Amino acid sequence: MPLPQVAIVGRPNVGKSTLFNRLLRQRRAIVEEVPGTTRDRIYGIVEWNDLRFGLFDTGGLLTEEEIERSSERELVEATKAQAELAIAEADLVIFVVDASAGPTAGDWEVADFLRRTDKPILLVANKAESREREFNALQFYELGLGDPIPVSALHGRGIADLLDAIAERLPRREEDGTAEAEAPKIAIVGRPNVGKSALLNAILGQPRQIVSPIPGTTRDAVDTELVWKGQPIVLIDTAGIRRPGRIERGIERYSILRAERAIERSDVAILVVDATEPFTHQDQAVAGKVLDAKKGIVVAINKWDLFEHMEGEGAREAFEEDAREAFHFMPWAPLVFVSALTGKNVEHVVDLALVVVAERSRRIPTAELNQLLREAIAHHPPPTRPGKWVKFYYVTQPEVNPPTFVFFCNRPQLVHFSYKRYLENRIRERYGFLGTPIELVFRERERSAPAWERGKAGRS
């Protein structure tokens, strides 16, 4: 089952990031950055006793009046969107307030907003470094969110009690080893109004056995586990996600953030685009997120029935050329012309996604890879510099998902990007790897020990 998620929210300068870092230092923690659109959303995994949970840090929430007065309106809107996204995905929200300041108008506004989310909330009064501050923390009871938990994130005071409180309120998700853990996860992503919801419904309308709905990590989405032609799969839905906003860019930014989280959990993303509209920067941005996450991708060109009706014969070839130009950075991604309304090619989209899943897990024998490398070098040797040249020794594939190839050579820093692209193209020409990015890594081969030392080591 997915890890339970916890979001830390509150107004600026109450110590949210300090608390985040303090929680991650408990036991063993893995920290990673989850890129946002203007600021990074920071995400980590916390382990406490027998519990593991994901933890989001968010930017400070301003009051509506402060937002109106802000000279960085766009940045403030982005920060607010990040926080709202984290709250929507959370199983539990930690609302951090400042015990040294007492309740403020900003605290009241955040509290009112959190009440409307119907999320479980832990009220945490930070900066309670003394008994007097702990007593002051009691004032926050008037916010109506339960008893405040006094802590000092800076000094670690009260952190164990806070972690125990988190453990009590989070849902327990058993690792039962059922099909969901092994089933390929396919995310349906794209900008608003391209037909993601219609495509999902068309897929679910195909004849198959729906096993069970799985609660997703977002407020608006439900992951669905089903059996597709004998193969268990999980569909991750990001369809129908909208955020009321004053400006279009805010809505656009929010939709990309939602798609981002779905992509992180997926193996393959079906990127839905609208055939009746020109390709946009947002289409490219969502595709870029898939590649950044090193996931597989299938491009589903939806509403094709409408476009074909308007444009007539020859429309497909011209459109495919435009699509290849728009997504020039992933020429290996398959394109599928579909109509969620009529059901045309809907089945083919899922079939292709499963092909991409298989491609991502392919391993190529080392002997075959080295034969390919020798042929590639013979056909086009690596460029040389005066007095310097690149000599390749061998190549191997140590990893899958995505397929990763490590080339050992004498001067990896001299391998030009154009030659890297050449080697990738040769790999794809022979082995395909449809719909998945592949990683090429260039390393200097470790110098072998002298023969007499190797013999001595073998006898010891």
From Swiss-Prot:
PROSITE patterns: G_ENGA. SMART domains: AAA. GO terms for molecular function: ATP hydrolysis activity; GTP binding; ribosome binding. Pfam families: KH_dom-like (PF14714), MMR_HSR1 (PF01926). Residues 4-174, 184-361 form the EngA-type G domain. GTP 1 binds at residues 10-17, 57-61, 126-129. It comes from the Bacteria. GTP 2 binds at residues 190-197, 237-241, 302-305. GO terms for biological process: ribosome biogenesis. InterPro entries: AAA+_ATPase, G_ENGA, GTP-bd, GTPase_Der, KH_dom-like, KH_dom-like_a/b, P-loop_NTPase, Small_GTP-bd. Residues 362-446 form the KH-like domain. Transmembrane segments: none annotated. Keywords: GTP-binding, Nucleotide-binding, Repeat, Ribosome biogenesis. Belongs to the TRAFAC class TrmE-Era-EngA-EngB-Septin-like GTPase superfamily. EngA (Der) GTPase family. GTPase that plays an essential role in the late steps of ribosome biogenesis. Associates with the 50S ribosomal subunit. HAMAP family: GTPase_Der. This is GTPase Der.
